[in-house]
Curated annotation (Swiss-Prot):
S-nitrosocysteine modifications at: 93
Function noted in UniProt: Involved in oxygen transport from the lung to the various peripheral tissues.
All residue ranges annotated as the Globin domain in the record: 2-146
Gene Ontology terms: cellular component: blood microparticle; haptoglobin-hemoglobin complex; hemoglobin complex
Pfam families given in the database record: Globin
Residues bearing the modification Phosphoserine: 44
GO BP, sorted A to Z: hydrogen peroxide catabolic process
Organism expressing this protein natively: Cynopterus sphinx (Indian short-nosed fruit bat)
Protein name: Hemoglobin subunit beta
Phosphothreonine PTM positions: 12
InterPro entries documented for this protein: Globin, Globin-like_sf, Globin/Proto, Hemoglobin_b, Hemoglobin_oxygen_transport
Length: 146
């Protein structure tokens, strides 16, 4: 991901304030509600029958935290995302058969959740930087599909 020094420091500065468990659960929950076809990858998560069931689901929250823990790792290796996410890309491609488009969708949902949590602090410039990051992560996760 090609970020200026200013963009990198803005991204990492904001990320230091992110409550990974809260934001991760909300982002994954919103993905499952807004794009219901993504629920097919989470059959073992129990009740996903309504928006409130999804958003209150402990397994959704736990997996959302796990996803953002990996994202946090990626933020420390912005210049080598493909290597950082190689194993996860392989897992999602070969074993889980996740449509790689879902990574892009989740990245965009994450940006929405960050905007919701940080309000005016999440400036258009910061959004632009985060869009670059989530696009880079989505591309890295889709790498093994090609």
């Amino acid at each position: 991901v090609h970020l200026s020094g200013e963009e990198k420091s803005a991204v990492t500065s904001l990320w230091g304030k992110v409550k990974v468990d809260e934001v991760g659960g909300e982002a994954l929950g919103r993905l499952l509600v807004v794009y219901p076809w993504t629920q097919r990858f989470f059959d073992s998560f129990g009740d996903l029958s309504s928006a409130s069931a999804v958003m209150g689901n402990a397994k959704v929250k736990a997996h959302g935290k796990k996803v953002l823990d990996s994202f946090s790792e990626g933020l420390q290796h912005l210049d080598s995302l493909k290597g950082t996410f190689a194993k996860l890309s392989e897992l999602h491609c070969d074993k889980l058969h996740v449509d790689p488009e879902n990574f892009r969708l989740l990245g965009n949902v994450l940006v929405v959740v960050l905007a919701r949590h940080f309000g005016k602090e999440f400036t258009p410039q910061l959004q632009a930087a985060y869009q670059k990051v989530v696009a880079g992560v989505a591309t890295a996760l889709a790498h093994k599909y090609h």
